[in-house]
């Protein structure tokens, strides 16, 4: 086995491959810089005179094969659909690491694996892509909007309660084709995904995070590896972003408290300003949208998320009693 050979596991969609290619690119770039400066820090186990050799391995997940509405897929959570087979290959030592969209990751990480690195975050917002270039406020009554997320459905109806929501599945290009073929008047997609596949020009309207909250972790890349693989863990440290990690921890903690998934109407977003973590959260259920924001120390992201969740739950209880 070559010392410098690394296999990255990824789904086969254009978006997943673009994300994996980006991670491959920055790993090679950082490694070459260390090689040039002969400064490898604590990284061990590589032939420091040779370049990294990185291969992408496409792994088909259950979510790629089963395109039914999420609510009709039994025996697994929605988030397990896109990672389980990849995690299995990692545990069997068939791949060294995997690149995931954080918002697709389950709360529970399998024993032996570690969410080790959060190298970057793209725009966390959602966007409207309409067939005729109309913004949300300009769409006709009873226009058909495509989304597979209860959060997006609730946020859409909070802004326009005279729209028809229709489920949609598939990758970005599949969804855009369904839109262009006339199945929908508009669809909602993550800005991050559109940008990463070079389709930001299709965006009709960017939604403001206060009025249309993104999913926790939206736009963040997560790199997973084996917990006992010190060689890969040390390598991933060179591309980890501490700010993104803090945002990840805050938003994942918020999601965990509300048992967040595509069937849970919650949203969360954060920004880092110096040593301050600014966190926004939304819970939208039973016809009532609760939105709160809070600021805390970036060194204590989970604590900040817990305080925000507590404020939202307090408001929810008040509504139920009133």
Functional labels for PLM-detected ranges:
Residues 85-86, 135, 174-175:
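Short acidic active-site motifs
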Residues 14-21, 25, 78-81, 107, ...:
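N-terminal winged-helix
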Residues 68-96:
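Short, structured active-site "lid" loops
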Residues 2-60, 65-66, 73-75, 158-322:
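Small-molecule-sensing regulatory modules
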Residues 102-103, 111-162:
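A conserved helix-loop-strand patch within extracytoplasmic ligand-binding domains
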Residues 86, 91-100, 182-192:
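Alpha-to-beta junction loops
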Residues 7-9, 57, 98, 116, ...:
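Short, well-ordered beta-strand segments
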């Amino acid at each position: 086995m070559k010392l410098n050979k690394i296999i990255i596991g990824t789904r086969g969609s254009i978006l997943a491959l673009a994300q994996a290619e980006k991670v491959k690119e920055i790993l090679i770039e950082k490694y070459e810089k260390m090689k040039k400066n002969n400064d490898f820090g604590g990284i061990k186990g590589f032939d420091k005179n040779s370049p990294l050799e990185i291969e992408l391995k496409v792994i088909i997940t259950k979510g790629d094969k089963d395109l039914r509405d999420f609510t009709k897929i039994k025996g697994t959570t929605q988030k397990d659909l896109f990672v389980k087979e990849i995690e299995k290959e990692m545990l069997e030592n068939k791949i060294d690491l995997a690149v995931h969209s954080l918002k697709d990751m389950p709360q529970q990480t399998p024993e032996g694996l570690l969410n080790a690195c959060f190298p970057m975050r793209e725009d966390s917002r959602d966007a409207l892509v309409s067939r005729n270039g109309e913004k949300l406020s300009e769409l006709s009554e009873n226009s058909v909007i495509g989304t597979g997320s209860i959060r997006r459905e609730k946020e859409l109806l909070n802004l326009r309660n005279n729209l028809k929501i229709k489920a949609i599945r598939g990758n970005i290009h599949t969804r855009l084709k369904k839109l262009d073929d006339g199945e929908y008047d508009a669809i909602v997609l993550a800005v991050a995904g559109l940008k990463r596949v070079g389709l930001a020009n299709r965006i009709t309207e960017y939604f403001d995070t206060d009025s249309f909250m993104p999913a926790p972790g939206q736009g963040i890349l997560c790199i997973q590896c084996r917990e006992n693989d010190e060689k890969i863990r040390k390598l991933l440290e060179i591309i980890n972003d501490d700010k993104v990690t803090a945002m990840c921890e805050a938003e994942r903690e918020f999601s965990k408290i509300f048992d967040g998934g595509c069937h849970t109407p919650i949203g969360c977003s954060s920004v880092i300003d110096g040593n301050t973590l600014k966190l926004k959260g939304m819970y939208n259920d039973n016809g009532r949208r609760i939105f709160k924001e809070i600021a805390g120390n970036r060194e204590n992201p989970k604590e900040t998320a817990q305080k925000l969740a507590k404020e939202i739950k307090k408001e929810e209880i008040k509504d139920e009693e009133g």
